[in-house]
Amino acid sequence: MHGGLSGRFARLLLACCVVTSSAALAEEYFVSIARGKGKDATKDKPAKDLGNLIAKLKDGDTVNIAEGVYAGRDESGSDSIGVAVKIVGGWADDFSGRDPWGAHRTIFTGVNTMGGSTQYRLILSPTNCAEILIDGIVFDNGPRNNYQGDKELIISRMATAGKNRNPSPESGAIKLELPKKCAGTLSNNVVMNTAPTGGAISAWGHQGGTLTIKNNLVINNTGEGIFAYSKWKSNKEQPRFIIENNTVLFSWKHDSIATYGGNGLKLDQDLLLTASNNVFAFGDYGGVDNIKLAKKITLKDNLFTGNRLYDYREFNTSVKVSEFEDEADQLEASTGNLTAEIKVPVGEAFAKLYAGRKEISRAAVDAKAKASNNGANALRGMLGLALQANGVADDADVWLPRLSIDDAIKAGTTKYEGKYGCQKP
């Protein structure tokens, strides 16, 4: 018995030493597109791009990234990291201070050329636990998309061989896959102009882990604004998602005739969720989609508006926000949710395109909808446009038109109704 206890103590001590050693060896690196050269990645001699450092990163490291536009190593448009790290953007070029959505924007994008990557812009898939964080990055896939015509009003899902262009990437901005028993955070990011089939933010929890998604602006994307996945298929030790103070606007269907995509938040089945103080607005389908029936989730103090078919869905039951407490079976402690005709300062040019786009059987959709403030004139009013007697016009042939970073950030700078959604960090 004594020997067994000694053996277990020795193994525990060794494990503690390994963890302590790993933390002690963690490095802090610096990246600047303006000054960067080589791989020292110090504050005085920063690297040029995150992609140039990936091979030397270890669990526990931190990468600080200065303002500027980053297209990835060799302009690949995608970075994939297999260790647990912190990625922190929004720094001044001398790393003296941060302003991620203002003066010191760290913009992750790419270029569209035949043969380039169409993967998620940033993929983080560690195998061990350490602090995992993506904070203060502006993800803009506009330059990576293939548009029909110079006005950039319609994305193309096909390659344009004559112009040496890839299809628009069918992936989003962030893909985070947690290992078992680990925690991770996505905060203070802007995700825009992505055209995924799945999530613009694709977040994968695992056994006994916690994934926090807070104060992000997710705007003008196809697919699901945030897709919460579970890698753990069990009713025990399900991964927990804490999704709070995010603003998710203009979630488009995959294309004009698609029957998928177009939700602010979509849920996998085997997970635990608390979503609070978010804005889920202008989804081509809905606000929160629980079609897979995640059990006993909490939606508290969220604002739903302008979604076309439902504010919340359980399997094939569509529910308006005013009916959550009566009609939903899988919600618990889900009070304080509401709707409001908010004013979204997204810019007049984009507002006119969005409100004037062609709609498929709009009248039929409105007739069966269980969503709040989803009428054509309500939408125009929230976008700051004059009301029209005839509803949505059918003369704008657009699909995911490119939105400027300035106009996007205007829509997320302050909370709506003083309480809901993100704000400038």
Pin down the residues of each PLM region.
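Right-handed parallel beta-helix
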Residues: G89, A130-P143, R157-N164, K181-A195, ...
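Right-handed parallel beta-helix/beta-solenoid
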Residues: A24-N52, V69
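N-terminal extracellular ligand-recognition/capping segment immediately after the signal peptide
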Residues: R35-K37, L50-G51, D59-D99
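Acidic, glycine- and Ser/Thr-rich low-complexity intrinsically disordered tracts
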Residues: S96-I107, V111-T113, N164, L293-P425
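Bacterial N-terminal signal peptides
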Residues: R11-S21
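Bacterial N-terminal signal peptides that target proteins for export
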Residues: H2-L13
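Short glycine/acidic-rich loop motifs that flank beta-strands on beta-rich extracellular proteins
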Residues: D74-S76, G97-R98, N112-L122, P143-K151, ...
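Right-handed parallel beta-helix/beta-spiral solenoid domain characteristic of secreted/periplasmic
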Residues: G82-R157, A161-G162
